[in-house]
Amino acid sequence: MEKVHLLCNAHLDPAWLWPWNDGLAEAISTFRVAADFCEQYDNFIFNHNEAVLYEWVEEHDPALFERIKTLVKKGNWRIMGGWYLQPDCVMTSGESLLSQISLGREYFKEKFGIVPTTAINFDPFGHSRGLAQILSKTGFDSYIIMRPAKFAGNFIWRGLDDSEIPVCCIYGSYNSLKGKALEKIKYIIEQHPEEKILLNLWGVGNHGGGPSRIDIENINEYIKNNDLKIIHSAAEDYFADVDTSSLPVVEEDLVPFAVGCYTSMVRIKQAHRRLENKIALAEKAMCYAEMVSDLKIDTEELKKAKKALAFCQFHDILPGSGIKKVEEDGLKCLNYGEEIVDRLYMKAFLKLAEGQKKANDGEIPILVFNPHPFEVEEELEVEFLLQNQNWTEDEWTIATVYDEKGNIVASQHEKTASSLNLDWVKKICFKAKLAPSSVNRFNCTLKQVKEKDLPSYQYGEDFISVKNERMTAIINRKTGLIEKYTVGGINRLVNAGKIEVYKDNEDPWGMTVSSFTDYLGDFTLMSDAAANEFAGYPEENYKSVRVIEDGDVRTTVEALFEYKRSVAVVQYSIPKNGTYIDINITLFSNEVNRMIKYNLSTAEGGEPCGETAFGISSYKNNNCDDEVVFQKWCGFKNEKGDVYVLNRGTYGGSFNEKDIKISLLRTPVYSGHPIHERDIAPHNRYLNHIDMGERHFSFRIVADQNVQNKALIFNEQPQVISFFPSGEGEKFGSIVTLDNNEVVLSSFKKTVNGYEVVLHNFANHNNSAELYIKPLDKRINLNFGKYELKILKF
């Protein structure tokens, strides 16, 4: 061993076993103590990352902030990492990881003139392989992590696109106990004599603290009396001494750790995805509107929403390992961001709607914004109100929907969001073909129809079947399950849709497990009597599997299941002319310390895989039933026929030979942390358990090879509203188009100097594409390597 770099830090979780305001107070206290020691000990260096903490100090203690700026110039205080905070790095999308970097970089460059080149994520519970490319493309030359411990040491991390970044997975922990730092430093040195250059972290952490006087003086005395070269140091200085030329190469996601966190606190995860989606969609709408109208993008308001999202991606909020108050605050924060983005989007939409002609008499216009740079064909929903309430008992108002050219499109009426039993509020579902990146126009005309003349559809006693030229979907009325799902003549699902219950414990992290396999039983179909009792109408005689919506567009089947004290309402929505099945589950969860999975049994199985940050993770080398993490989709790739499950905020699951098991929810206690042989939580009282009560889940089963764009549409849905335009202004057609469906337009953003577009090749081979931006008359021809990410600025 030639040299030891001591990196003093104060790991400070903004929220975890304490709420954010406690974290704010501790940040100020910790930074003040660290500044004192930096001023008192000339050789001492304090390192800290996370822009959000510096923002808090700047706002609430500006004098301390000025001291820190002076210490940064002197070199005693080093800005570390440069991100907004340490986010979860497996569930956070590639686009959000870019945002974490840009928010932090913008802040540190503006306030300190510093751009760190070593990224830091000590505490997150794993790292997507897509991050290797993200770091390389954003100017980082190295990365320091702590988990999973099986990767401890230095290595080259090779991304999906073959980009490479040196990584140090630290030995031991990022922190030390007060007065015990030297003891820890000595231990790490003794345990790893093989290391030529060693990185050793110390400082009281988790709830802040950082350096202490006794630790600094003990360490300085040790340095003075030791022949080994030991220095107070920083991340970049450590990597400057490391010879990376012969390091081993790692070509995989850096997982698993805390696999329960892929599922704990589903409401946080769903709200997180919803805000991710809305920011992406709103930014596209705002940029498109700015290019074709007088709209000025409110970048400061948008940044508030982005910071709300970034904060809730923190590695104890998004993973669900915080206390109940942290969950509640996280939901408030995400809702705050969503409210901002909804208003910004609506402003942009109204600008994009300019130039639409006024509606004719008796016509109700429907406007649909397609944010995507390609044509979308989708079943859409819209609600509007009749001009007058219709109080005629046996008569209903029916709409006919036309496209812009006057062609009738398939449509049907469905139950509205309200339960007002009056012909006034109307909900229409219609099949639409949408031009790229533009507002599309549809029109409705109305007529009154006698109730006896409304169409009716008949289904068999044992099965409910929906068939078209490409797909067959059959729901079994005796089981409530998907009996068969066939696309292109190939059977994809068989007896699928069981809701399975597994024994779990109080630990929301799932720290001590890699899978959940202690099977306890299935939810079973309710009897008809029990289903009517649950619905609140015991005197009725409806079936527990029944058609609740039907028409020319789709059939929706509802099935009710039960398990002990819990109930599941499953709705299958099957298009009359599509090739997918939408599944919406309302789960009333009342079992503690359980994992609940949704098992989709396939006909053939295949290679299990799922979306990761700007790429695809393969799980073929995992053990059977290992818990895995994915983003917008997962499924089986198979030459005989693929099958994938799209989601809107579900991140965990497992695979065996033929089953896709989506992890719906877990019910551990809040922040129940395993400690050696102790009980995880006290047994002498009632404890709050996570995800008890009503929860909602949304999935789409597809058999398409172009799964990435399908998942994008399912998450960033075309936006529909009934709106009567003025007829004024200039109508603009498709604003942005992209001619290769394997290349994904991830974002279109406003920057200080123009626009930024993020695209990535979602294929394991080279690709090319043309991006056309019509208002700027700009054609950009692009060549991509496999899984390559491109960030264009103009």
Task: Walk through the language-model features, giving the residues of each.
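Surface-exposed loop and adjacent secondary-structure segments within mature catalytic domains
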Residues: R67-K74, E95, S128-N175
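N-terminal catalytic cores of secreted or lumenal carbohydrate-active enzymes
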Residues: M1-Q100, Y107-K111, K137-D141, L254, ...
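Conserved, mostly hydrophobic/aromatic
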Residues: N9, G104, L135, A234, ...
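C-terminal domain-boundary segment and adjacent tail
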Residues: C8, F46-E55, S136, A149, ...
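CE4/NodB-like, metal-dependent polysaccharide N-deacetylase domain
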Residues: L97-G130, I134-K137, I185-L201
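Terminal accessory/anchoring regions of large secretory-pathway or extracellular enzymes
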Residues: A25, A35-C38, N220-I230, D237-F794
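Alpha-amylase-like alpha-glycosidases and glucanotransferases acting on alpha-linked glucans and related
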Residues: G153-N200, V204
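Alpha-helical scaffold elements lining the catalytic groove of polysaccharide deacetylases
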Residues: C89-Y107, Y171-E190, T555
